[in-house]
Swiss-Prot record:
Organism expressing this protein natively: Caulobacter vibrioides (strain NA1000 / CB15N) (Caulobacter crescentus)
Described function: Forms part of the ribosomal stalk which helps the ribosome interact with GTP-bound translation factors. Is thus essential for accurate translation.
Protein name: Large ribosomal subunit protein bL12
HAMAP family the record matches: Ribosomal_bL12 (MF_00368)
An individual GO BP term: translation
GO molecular function, one term: mRNA binding
Record family assignment: Belongs to the bacterial ribosomal protein bL12 family.
Domain of life according to the entry: Bacteria
InterPro entries associated with the record: Ribosomal_bL12 (IPR000206), Ribosomal_bL12_C (IPR013823), Ribosomal_bL12_C/ClpS-like (IPR014719), Ribosomal_bL12_oligo (IPR008932), Ribosomal_bL12_oligo_N_sf (IPR036235)
Gene: rplL
Assigned keywords, A-Z: Ribonucleoprotein, Ribosomal protein
Pfam families, sorted: Ribosomal_L12, Ribosomal_L12_N
């Protein structure tokens, strides 16, 4: 197996979050950007305006769509994610679904929070 094939095999085992982190580290080390300005330029000037409008979202909102059957577990996780909430506020948030759990967080934070709440039994949407 060649050096490149071994590297491909190793990279294939990374999770999406690990791959994103690797991408950021390589961008920093090599002083490049993974953005695709070349593709926009190659597409022509007419396509440039829609591409700018469709910029990647940087801030996300985690929405609790449904508390599910295991509301107690979900309430505990909501309190873990939002320590500023008391028990009553967390309970009201879960029972009043759909509700925003957190707003203006990074994609990675939104995915981590979504995973925790989903594992607790909630139905989550990231906007």
């Amino acid at each position: 197996m060649s050096k490149l094939e071994k590297l491909v095999e190793e990279l294939s085992t990374l999770s999406v979050l690990e791959a994103a982190e690797l991408s950021k580290l390589l961008e920093e080390k090599w002083g490049v950007s993974a953005a695709a300005p070349v593709a926009v330029a190659a597409a022509g000037g007419a396509a440039a305006a829609p591409a700018e409008a469709a910029e990647e979202q940087t801030e996300f909102t985690v929405v609790l769509v449904d508390g599910g059957d295991k509301k107690i577990n979900v309430i505990k996780e909501v309190r873990g994610v939002r320590p500023d909430l008391g028990l009553k506020e967390a309970k009201d948030l879960v029972e009043g679904a759909p509700q925003n759990v957190v707003e203006n967080v990074s994609k990675q934070q939104a995915e981590e929070i979504s995973k925790k709440l989903t594992e607790a039994g909630a139905k989550i949407q990231i906007k």
